[in-house]
């Protein structure tokens, strides 16, 4: 595959203009064991997960993790079982207590809060959606959705109105008086989404919410998350073991292994420039033309473009640009805004497509 004249930089920190991150994580550790706090900062902390467990009986869940999530971003954390991804999302709200490190939500230090402030933050600023729906079987849909508002102390009329709005938002109008056991798995997860949204949180966190659903229902729920994000614009942290799900949902993806960050990047960065063999294996089956943008396949502009050459943006997906490029009589101009950054022709496009077919 032809690369650009200037290989795109990896997005190790959040995009943006210096605004306060929605989520800021710095130097986060979680070690399970009775002397966990004594290990941080010692030579033992440099041992591999296996070596540390063999020598001390302690297990590293998360090792020195740092990242930012921008306001409004869908940030996906993925990895295989045991990679630490579910531990990480629980550390963000201190459902599991960190051994060391800092977590902030919109500038507020979660790791420094007392129990009262932490409880208030969980009630008002963060909502979580888990794989297991956790619906109350004796409550109707609308009352399940309103439950968090009830715990928060809001009046019955106010919380019922808000709950009905969220029921309608997630496409369950007409089911508000049904009980959970009268709903399909996908519908129950929609109730979970509505309940999470009802509190109007600043950050939504998802821990593999769709992994137990049938493939078609899972796809529908992924599309529902995309639609809801477009409508409400919430910051989302999404945990998954499924690369296809990560590529579909994520603005950026953090890949974990053995409690450590392996790579952070946009979907096209992860597929186009995998950090190591672990990531390369993850992405080997991905149809690259569906993920890579033109900046990954374009060549330097040599100055011989036709005046009427088609113009394409550098962040356009190869698959979406293919018809225009293949129908053009010569190379197409690739721009970043108004600046020409390269050219692309049919050979560049076909090189990606042929590589997929020969995989």
Regions found by a protein language model. Give the residues of each.
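ABC ATPase "signature
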Residues: 264-265, 273, 343
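The conserved cystathionine-beta-synthase
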Residues: 307-330, 334-339, 344-359
């Amino acid at each position: 595959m032809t690369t650009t004249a200037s290989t795109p930089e990896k997005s190790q920190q959040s995009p943006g203009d210096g605004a306060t991150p929605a989520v800021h994580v710095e130097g986060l550790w979680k070690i399970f064991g009775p002397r966990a706090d004594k290990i941080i900062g010692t030579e033992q902390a440099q041992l591999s997960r296996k070596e540390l467990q063999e020598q001390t009986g302690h297990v590293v869940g998360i090792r020195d993790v740092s990242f930012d999530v921008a306001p409004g971003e869908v940030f996906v954390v993925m990895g295989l079982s045991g990679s630490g991804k579910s531990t990480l999302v629980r550390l963000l709200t201190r459902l599991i207590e960190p051994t060391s490190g800092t977590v902030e939500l919109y500038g507020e230090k979660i790791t420094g809060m007392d129990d009262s402030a932490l409880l208030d933050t969980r009630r008002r600023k963060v909502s979580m959606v888990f794989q297991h729906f956790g619906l109350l079987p004796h409550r109707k849909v609308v009352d399940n959705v309103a439950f968090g508002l009830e715990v928060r102390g809001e009046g019955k009329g106010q919380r019922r109105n808000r709950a009905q709005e969220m029921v309608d938002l997630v496409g369950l109008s007409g089911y508000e008086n049904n009980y959970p056991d009268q709903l399909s798995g996908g519908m129950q997860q929609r109730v979970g989404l509505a309940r999470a949204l009802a509190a109007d949180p600043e950050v939504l966190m998802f821990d593999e919410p769709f992994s137990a659903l049938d493939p078609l229902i899972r796809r529908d729920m992924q599309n529902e998350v995309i639609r809801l994000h477009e409508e409400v614009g919430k910051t989302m942290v999404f945990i998954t073991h499924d690369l296809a799900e990560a590529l579909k949902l994520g603005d950026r993806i953090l890949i974990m292994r053995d409690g450590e960050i392996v790579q952070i990047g946009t979907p096209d960065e992860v597929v186009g420039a995998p950090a190591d063999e672990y990531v390369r294996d993850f992405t080997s089956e991905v149809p690259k033309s569906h993920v890579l943008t033109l900046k990954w396949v374009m060549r330097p502009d040599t100055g011989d473009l036709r005046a009427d050459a088609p113009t394409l943006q550098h962040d356009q997906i190869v698959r979406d640009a293919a018809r225009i490029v293949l129908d053009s009589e010569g190379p197409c101009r690739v721009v970043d805004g108004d600046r020409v950054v390269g050219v692309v022709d049919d050979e560049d496009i076909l090189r990606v497509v042929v590589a997929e077919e020969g995989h």
